[in-house]
Each structure stands twice: as C-alpha cells, then as structure tokens.
Amino acid sequence: MSAPKNGHESFKNLDTAAVQAGRPPVTPDGPINPPIVLSSTMHAGGPYGYMRDWNATLDSLEQAIGALEGGRCTVFSSGMAAANAIFDLFPQGKPVVASQYSYTGVAMRLKELHDLGRIE
C-alpha cells in the first residue's frame, strides 16, 4: 500500500480515509491536524480573503469530506448560503415544490424568486 498523499507515513497501513483525509503535510514540529482559523479577514495576495468566503479550515474540511465520499465537496458558511447555491441551479421559470414548514429564510427567498419570475 502506498503512503497517503498527505505524507503521514505513520498512517500508511490504515485502510480508512477518515483518519487521513484533510490533514496537512508532515513537517518537523508541524501539526497533525489542520489548525482552526478564527480570523475573519486575511492579508491580500493569497488564496484566502474573507472568512465567510473561504479559509484554510474550510479547505481541509472539503478535502476530508470529498475523500470520504469519493468525490468533490463544497461547504458553506450558512444554511442559507447552501440553499441559495441550490436555488441558483433551478431552471428559469420552472415549478418548485417546497414544504410549507421550511426555515423562514428559505420560504422568503423562494417567494422572492417567485415574485421575480425566476421560479413558478
């Protein structure tokens, strides 16, 4: 069995991605688990800018879930962000069936999309 791509030689004999996925590369005195990033903003010029958009913690989480599911993963900063991402996939003017007992924010967004003619 080859060593995992994250470089954790000590995990090369484990048959589960749950223990290995999303971990940082092995470096002397480096963390075994990814650090939790608590800052809301980052210095310009790198891959991360604003916490709600993206950060290193979310990147590690996506890698881990994607490895466990055998595909790609996208995480969101809130349930409404996830709901809006799904709503953006709805074809223009098509009917949408939703529960009347949904989260109020979801119901309000669906009503707004209906009033704009985006959904039926």
PLM regions: where:
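Conserved N-terminal alpha-helix of the aminotransferase class I/II PLP-enzyme fold
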Residues: 34-89, 101-114
